């Protein structure tokens, strides 16, 4: 995916484009579309068959992963790890297709019911996001069989499921060895628009972005993005006249002189310090304008509708034209965050702390997420910067690609309008903050979209 930031008359729009090519190291280039198919019916098991002698096979975990992947990979899912016991089995899996999580859970549950031996009466499904186990949803096998065609099966399946925090590393869990280390890449076009206030000119730059990522271990990755202009008219930009440090207002200079540009080049380590505590450490060229070190901790129990977070960054502003160079400006930023999830897809977030220009303040945002993947929200920032732009407001909309293409996809078009070109109240533009990774897999949002479980 490529992100395009559009700046016109002080308003910034961000668009995530789904056009691109991707592949793995040594693999073929692929533009193969996916088409949604009806789910496979659940095969009823014999509850009297409690023989667990199948566990005596030394290769049983490997064999089970093989057959699960045979069923799941056509669905856009992938086995990350598997834990087998005589009466229960835990599947840790990646969801690469469905933007509504319960639909992925439903497909994974059907696969377990049709592959696991009859003695396994309990299934635990644990989605994995960038190496993080984000929640565990436990089903009784008989419930899946009884509720599949029940007229009230959606409600009953949710009420009887148990949503909890995953055990960080349960004994006996076996990972798929082919997943780590793993190299992946993507290539796609994007467009940037810039408005130069001093010359009152509207400018554009059509560019290509190449992304690469090496997943070394679960949660540990090295990644980077390089951009190159294809054509455009972004030129002769003049420095901003803002009295604050130009952390955002000189963005036109980054576009003009950054050709080619190493947009990001960083290492990320995501891990869980406890079942409900998520941690992120990032270092390198974190975004186009800043590089340094970033750390984040999130406390968010899977069955709870609120959470708390803390983020601290020590960064230095990058040079305009020097690919790896820096300017002299350094700053420490940090935020305490509170997250609230209400009924009907409504959520709120409050961030209080220090911004990139050295100003202090708070940001509040409210979003409404719909069961079809759409979302819309508003945000506002107020800081103590003694400038006219000390208040920033805007709104954002997410349009899922599957709404346009009518096929399942996690790709989305994200458009945000607001005064984000101002220096006051500006945060780092990080692409891997923790709450955005775990939110959709926790109880509140699962409940709001559970109607897709049997789809």
Language-model-detected regions and their locations in the chain:
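Feature captures outer-membrane beta-barrel proteins of Gram-negative bacteria and organelles
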Residues: 30, 206-216, 263-273, 292-312, ...
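Short edge beta-strands and adjacent turn/loop segments
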Residues: 35, 41-43, 69-92
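Outer-membrane beta-barrel channel domains
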Residues: 101-178, 213-216, 221-301, 306, ...
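Outer-membrane beta-barrel domain signature
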Residues: 195-201, 209-211, 252-258, 268, ...
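Solvent-exposed loop/turn segments connecting transmembrane beta-strands
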Residues: 196-204, 216, 230-233, 257-263, ...
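Flexible, surface-exposed loop regions and adjacent strand-edge segments
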Residues: 203-204, 238-246, 299, 325-330, ...
């Amino acid at each position: 995916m490529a992100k395009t930031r559009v700046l016109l008359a002080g308003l910034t729009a961000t668009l995530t484009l789904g056009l691109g090519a991707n592949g793995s190291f040594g693999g073929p280039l692929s533009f193969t579309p996916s088409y949604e198919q009806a789910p496979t019916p659940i095969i009823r098991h014999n509850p009297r068959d409690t023989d667990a002698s199948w566990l005596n096979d030394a290769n049983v975990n490997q064999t089970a992963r093989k057959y699960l992947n045979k069923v799941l990979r056509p669905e856009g899912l992938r086995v990350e790890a598997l834990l087998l016991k005589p009466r229960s089995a835990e599947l840790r899996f990646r969801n690469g297709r469905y933007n509504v999580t319960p639909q992925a859970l439903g497909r994974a549950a059907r696969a377990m019911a049709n592959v696991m031996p009859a003695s396994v009466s309990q299934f635990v499904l644990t989605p994995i996001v960038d190496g993080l186990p984000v929640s565990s949803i436990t089903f009784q096998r008989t419930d899946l069989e009884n509720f599949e065609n029940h007229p009230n099966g959606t409600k009953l399946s949710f009420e009887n499921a148990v949503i909890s925090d995953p055990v960080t590393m349960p004994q006996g869990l076996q990972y798929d060895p082919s997943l780590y280390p793993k190299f992946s890449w993507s290539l796609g076009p994007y467009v940037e628009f810039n408005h130069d206030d001093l010359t009152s000119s509207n400018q554009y730059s059509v560019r290509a972005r190449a992304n690469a990522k090496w997943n070394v271990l679960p949660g540990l990755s090295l990644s980077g993005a390089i951009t190159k202009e294809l054509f455009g008219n972004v030129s002769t930009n003049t420095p901003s006249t803002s009295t604050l440090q130009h952390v955002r207002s000189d963005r036109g200079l980054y576009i003009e002189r950054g050709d080619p540009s190493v947009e990001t080049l960083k290492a990320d380590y995501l891990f869980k310090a406890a079942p409900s505590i998520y941690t992120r450490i990032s270092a390198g060229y974190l975004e186009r304008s800043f590089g340094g070190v970033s750390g984040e901790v999130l406390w968010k129990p899977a069955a709870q509708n609120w959470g708390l977070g803390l983020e601290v960054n020590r960064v230095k502003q990058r040079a305009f034209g020097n690919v790896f160079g820096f300017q002299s400006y350094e700053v420490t930023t940090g935020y305490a965050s509170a997250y609230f999830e209400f009924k009907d897809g409504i959520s709120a977030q409050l961030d209080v702390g220090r911004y990139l220009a050295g100003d202090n303040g708070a940001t509040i945002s409210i979003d409404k997420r719909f069961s079809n993947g759409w979302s819309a929200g508003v945000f506002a920032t107020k800081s103590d910067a003694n400038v006219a732009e000390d208040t920033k407001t805007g709104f954002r909309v997410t349009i899922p690609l599957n709404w346009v293409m009518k096929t399942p996809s996690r790709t989305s078009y994200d458009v945000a309008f607001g005064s984000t070109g101002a220096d006051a109240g500006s945060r780092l533009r990080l692409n891997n903050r923790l709450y955005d990774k775990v939110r959709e897999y926790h109880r509140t949002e699962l409940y709001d979209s559970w109607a897709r479980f049997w789809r």
